[in-house]
Regions:
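Juxtamembrane intracellular "pre-TM" segments in multi-pass secondary transporters
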Residues: 2-17, 206-235
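Transmembrane alpha-helix termini and helix-breaking/packing motifs in multi-pass membrane transporters
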Residues: 43-48, 159-181, 365-381
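Conserved MFS/SLC helix-loop-helix module at the cytosolic interface between two early adjacent transmembrane helices
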Residues: 69-106, 285-291
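Structural signature of the two symmetry-related core transmembrane helices
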Residues: 86-100, 191, 292-307, 387
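C-terminal membrane-cytosol helix-exit motif in multi-pass small-molecule transporters
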Residues: 169, 191-211, 393-401
Length: 403
């Protein structure tokens, strides 16, 4: 695992700067916590609080948009002050503080407020964390660096979901609906790894040497960016309008008859395929280019969403969750590496903020549309809509965005 000394004087881990590995550990611990506490929010809203599907879409979309807006400004701020780590620490700390309050939630409004706090933290930390990773690797290592980080992040999700499945089994067995007692146990256990993630970040991640100062202080605007980056953001927005909150795939699994513990185990399958795909996809993108892999991932997404629309039995959903993980593994880390390819080093924080901002802002209308289609048409309708926009995005990235 450890190899020759890096330029910072610390031994490399998996052939990369140690920052990448320890940021992966931070994300792993955070995802253990997040998957235990927040993944089952749609079931908590519907099964425990009796909320409508449109409310689920509102909570999912609004929380992601909060994350998005903050990413724009935190990315810009990290470029302006040339400090990534303090913003990352602040963001992870806010999310950790918000999580225990889910134990006290008694209405969808309180859930929305707590999710706002959690996403506030994520919005602050994510661009700085991504910029720290990009600053810690060479251009030739970028895909591998982001791929390793995504693989570790997703490994945390698998561990969190596996632990959640054990708790669900011990508390409520194979019940079709989530109980309040079960959810409260998930919160109590899930807070612990969140605290540990902040400790690791403070102790083991080091600020990299800042990039050379720009002639002008960075501004939050697109004018200074390459046309390729602007077109990529447009195509991402089109795709994301059909990529509603993952709350809906969870609700669809339950809608087709899957019990709570089966839903959690399906999510384990999703995250396993995600983790197994992320690093190879990153390495492949370093060799073959990133645009084609993103397009291929969107094609898989379209097929999976068509599958969710057409599915009629719970066993079919297991296969769809596996395919959904392949899509995530192919696209998430590769798209972030592609952003770094398209922008100068001194604007990376701002670029990541804009990228995450465009994606997150599109998630609010995407989730509201999905909730409305579910209630007004049928549970399959949001997935037909998502598949159509994925095909459109695939055509857009191949036809408009150059490597």
């Amino acid at each position: 695992m450890f190899s020759n000394q890096s330029r910072s004087g610390r031994g490399k881990v998996f052939g990369l700067n140690p920052n990448v590995f320890f940021l992966g550990i931070v994300s792993l611990l955070t995802d253990v916590s997040t998957e235990m506490i927040f993944t089952l929010v749609p079931l908590f809203l519907c099964n425990v609080l009796g909320a409508a599907t449109t409310i689920v879409g509102l909570v999912g979309g609004a929380s992601e948009s909060t994350d998005a807006i903050l990413r724009i400004f935190s990315g810009w701020l990290s470029d302006r002050v040339k400090k990534r780590k303090p913003l990352a620490v602040l963001g992870y700390s806010i999310s950790t503080i918000a999580k225990p309050f889910m134990y006290l939630a008694t209405s969808w409004g309180s859930v929305l407020a707590i999710r706002f706090g959690d996403r506030l933290g994520k919005g602050i930390r994510t661009p700085s964390r991504d910029a720290l990773i990009a600053d810690s690797v060479s251009a030739q290592e970028r895909g591998r660096g982001f791929g390793l980080h995504r693989a570790m992040d997703t490994t945390g999700a698998v561990l969190g979901l596996a632990l959640a499945a054990v708790i669900i089994y011990l508390v409520q067995g194979g019940g079709l609906e989530l109980s309040l007692k079960t959810y409260q146990w998930l919160i109590v256990v899930g807070v612990v790894p969140a605290v540990l993630s902040v400790v690791v970040l403070l102790s083991f991640v080091h600020e990299r040497k800042p990039p050379p100062p720009a002639r002008q202080l960075p501004r939050i605007r697109l004018a200074g960016f390459d046309t390729r980056f602007k077109l990529f953001l447009i195509v991402m927005a089109i795709f994301t309008l059909g990529n509603s909150s993952d709350f809906f795939v969870i609700l669809r699994a339950q809608n087709l008859g899957a019990s709570v513990i089966y839903v959690v185990l399906m999510l384990v399958v999703f995250n396993l395929t995600y983790a197994l795909t992320a690093l190879p996809a990153g390495v492949l993108s370093d060799r073959l280019g990133r645009r084609g892999l993103i397009a291929a991932g969107w094609f898989i997404y379209a097929l999976v969403y068509l599958g969710f629309a057409l599915a009629s039995e719970p066993w079919q959903v297991w296969l769809l969750f596996a395919g959904y993980g392949v899509y995530y593994g192919m696209v998430e880390g590769v798209a972030r590496a592609f952003v770094a390819d398209l922008v100068p080093v001194e604007k990376r924080g701002t670029a990541y903020g804009l990228y995450h901002g465009v994606v997150g802002l599109a998630l609010l209308p995407a989730s509201l549309i999905a909730g409305w289609l579910w209630d007004a048409v049928n549970p399959a309708a949001p997935f037909y809509f998502g598949a159509a926009l994925a095909f459109l995005g695939m055509v857009g990235i191949m036809g408009l965005v150059r490597e």
